[in-house]
Swiss-Prot record:
Name this polypeptide is given: GDSL esterase/lipase At1g71250
Gene3D superfamilies in UniProt: SGNH hydrolase
SUPFAM superfamilies: SGNH hydrolase
Keywords assigned by UniProt, alphabetized: Glycoprotein, Hydrolase, Lipid degradation, Lipid metabolism, Secreted, Signal
Length: 374
């Protein structure tokens, strides 16, 4: 596809785009460096962007346990909302640890939890009500309960001093916010939040709830916490397909709504770092990273930025990927796998930018630098 850069321009609210030289450096970083694990464990909370299969065990329509999901994981659908690996799988490789298993899987117990657990659940939001239109899901609050269950088990598996050190060196990743908009605020036919709250007030509601749980992580003894912001949702096929803007343009009104949340989350990270001795909270600038990819697709090897590889209708985003649907053959040239989620190739770029990137990608330090702090 011949993308028109002027038409595709993503407005990213003042964020600085990465220079071509930085792009080249990030893309040339090795996929996996053999050696000692950089962290003892990684605990993952979030939504479908990082779900590793928890929703397979819930009564919900938000599932990805069927082909063509997993087509590039030896045709094995695991519940990941991707053609292959998620952001977390690829970050785990960079950290040189196994990808954390899903909490809801009955086999996630014993020694299997020692290097971390994934609690993420498709359709989950910061607010309990977000995503209810899909059925069962573990909200942020429930995922925190599930995390505490795991920590109680781990406490019995090591000495008190070792447990304290283990928690302090482990990494926590939280990926929330998308469903509070896509499956709440931007669905006025099902939710009244857009009537009750102006965009800044809704963002403040989300941030206050988020802050409470981020502080809870500190009280539990966790000290390294990575918090990616929300991507430019107005550019995903699902939102393009609504017909608010031409099909080759992002929905700017949606992206503008997200600005307050992302800016507030970055400010919250500053506040948390000031009031949490010995901890490091890091903001991941997903909005800018995706915006950079969409504005400069050729620099990353992409040729299709405005429609899904697997989906139906306008932008292949009106109906998301269906069981046994035939996806596009050139998946590494697509930014979006289905109506909502990036391809494995796009996830790989996001993971590398989080791990190696400058402060415009990960603030105030990147994930690699986080692992070196004690």
């Amino acid at each position: 596809m011949n993308t028109n850069r002027k038409k595709m321009k993503v407005h990213i609210g003042g964020y600085v785009l990465i220079l071509a030289l930085t792009v080249s450096v990030i893309l040339q970083q090795p996929e996996l460096v053999t050696g000692q694990a950089r962290v003892p464990a990684m605990f993952v909370l979030g939504d479908s962007l990082v779900d590793a299969g928890n929703n397979n065990f819930l009564q919900t329509v938000a599932r990805a346990n069927f082909l063509p999901y997993g087509i590039d994981m030896n045709y094995q659908p695991t519940g990941r909302f991707s053609n292959g690996l998620t952001f977390i799988d690829l970050l785990a490789r960079l950290l040189e640890i196994p990808s954390p298993p899903p909490f809801a899987d009955p086999t996630t117990s014993g020694n299997r939890i020692l290097q971390g657990v994934n609690y993420a659940s498709a359709a989950a939001g910061i607010l309990d009500v977000s995503g209810y239109n899909y059925g069962g899901r573990f909200s942020l609050n429930q995922q925190m309960v599930n995390l505490e269950t795991t920590l109680s088990q781990l406490r019995t598996m090591m000495s008190p001093q070792n447990f304290t050190d283990y928690l302090a060196r482990s990494l926590v990743v939280l990926v929330f916010g998308s469903n509070d908009y896509i499956n709440n605020y931007l669905m006025p036919n099902l939710y009244d939040s857009s009537i009750r709250f102006r965009p800044p007030d809704f963002a403040n509601l989300l941030l206050s709830q988020y802050a409470r749980q981020l502080l809870t992580l500190y009280s539990l003894g966790l000290r390294k916490i990575f918090i990616p912001g929300v991507a430019p949702l107005g550019c995903i096929p699902n939102q393009r397909a609504r017909g608010i803007s031409p099909p080759d343009r992002c929905v700017d009104s949606v992206n503008q709504i997200l600005g307050t949340f992302n800016q507030g989350l970055k400010s919250l990270v500053d506040q948390l770092n000031q009031r949490s001795p010995g901890a490091i909270y890091v903001y991941g600038n997903t909005y800018s990273a995706i915006g950079d990819i969409l504005n400069n697709p050729a620099a990353y090897g992409f040729s299709v930025v405005d429609r899904a590889c697997c989906g139906i209708g306008r932008n292949q985003g009106q109906i998301t990927c269906l069981p046994l649907q035939t996806p596009c053959p050139n998946r590494n040239q697509y930014v979006f796998w289905d109506a909502f989620h990036p391809t494995q190739t796009a996830n790989s770029i996001l993971a590398r930018r989080a791990f190696y990137g400058p402060p415009s990608d990960a603030y105030p330090v990147n994930v690699q630098q986080m692992t070196l702090l004690h």
